[in-house]
A protein has these predicted regions:
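Extended, solvent-exposed segments with strong compositional bias
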Residues: 182-213
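A glycine-anchored, Pro-Gly-centered beta-turn/N-cap motif
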Residues: 214, 220-228, 232
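Generic structural detector for well-ordered beta-strands
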Residues: 207, 217-219, 262-264
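Bacterial N-terminal signal peptides
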Residues: 9-20
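Short, solvent-exposed loop/turn positions at domain surfaces
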Residues: 130-132, 204, 218
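Primarily secretory-pathway and cell-envelope proteins
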Residues: 25-189, 234-270
Length: 270
């Protein structure tokens, strides 16, 4: 009798163990491997997730002395308003992929390759269309919870969130930041572009507290003046190299420059 009880107990224990392992595997499988970055506004009444926006990228020959100096450049405002056709950039014209390089070499001979390697340097400007954000805050001291731990193709330890002030350009768009790069940088798949080494932006002094891998609490150190702002994700190292192709396509580490959460501090904010 005791032997039968022991056998039954062993069978139950084995079944529980198998079920436990299977349940754990099922839970792991149900959990998404990738998750797009999120920014949540945290306040006394609860929390509100801000909509994630995609930046537009424009080109100009003007040097980026400041965002204010670029705000009057029609090439910048027109480029951001029209938006960049990322698909066209990936397929046409600026051929620097393996296939494109072969086509250029066959059609343009060695001279064409030499000229291609001497592309002039231009200024790339990131911005968002429209003169104002639809996310209007009534507080001058917002608190945000930022999570990009599951961002696809991104090492979260390489990035941290920031708050930047946006610059209104000709009442048509808001400028986020700018940097220098080769004219064909957006078509390069190789990670050879130090985007952030000379990046121009109006960063706000902020309290940045890491709560986990790719997870942060973020708030300004001082009350914000009324105006246009954004939460952005930036490389911790200014020498981090990026693929211009990834930036154009909004994928991998390049996605971090293409992603923004805008907000407006109202005139009557407290």
């Amino acid at each position: 009798m005791k032997s039968s009880v022991w056998k039954l107990a062993a069978m139950v224990s084995l079944a529980v163990g198998v079920c436990g392992g299977a349940c754990a595997q099922a839970q792991q499988a149900a959990k998404p491997r990738w998750q797009m970055p999120t920014v949540t506004l945290v306040h006394d009444a609860g929390s509100q997730e801000l909509p994630r926006e995609k930046t537009q990228l424009a080109e100009t020959k003007s040097k980026p002395q400041s965002l204010a100096s670029l705000a009057g450049d029609s090439a910048v405002t027109q480029g951001i308003q029209a938006g960049v056709n990322d698909a066209a950039w990936g397929v046409a014209g600026h051929m620097n992929s393996a296939v494109g390089g072969t086509a250029v070499t066959q059609g343009g001979s060695i001279l064409g390759g030499m000229l291609a390697s001497r592309k002039p340097t231009v200024t790339y400007v990131w911005g968002v269309p429209g003169p104002a954000s639809g996310n209007i805050l009534k507080t001058t001291s917002p608190k945000f919870s930022v999570n990009f731990a599951g961002a696809p193709g991104v090492n979260p330890s390489d990035f941290a969130p920031e708050i930047v002030r946006l610059t209104l350009a000709q009442n048509t768009c808001r400028l986020i930041g700018a940097t220098r790069g080769k004219e064909d940088a957006r078509s390069h798949d190789a990670a050879d572009w130090e985007i952030y080494s000379g990046f121009v932006e109006d960063r706000v002094a902020a309290n940045v507290q890491k709560t986990g891998e790719g997870q942060y609490d973020l708030s300004p150190q001082s009350p914000l003046y009324p105006g246009e702002y954004a939460v952005v994700l930036r490389p911790i190292s200014k020498n981090e190299k990026f693929s211009g192709g990834d930036v154009s396509r909004g994928q991998g580490a390049g996605m971090m420059f293409d992603t923004v959460w805008t907000f407006q501090v109202a005139e009557n904010a407290q």
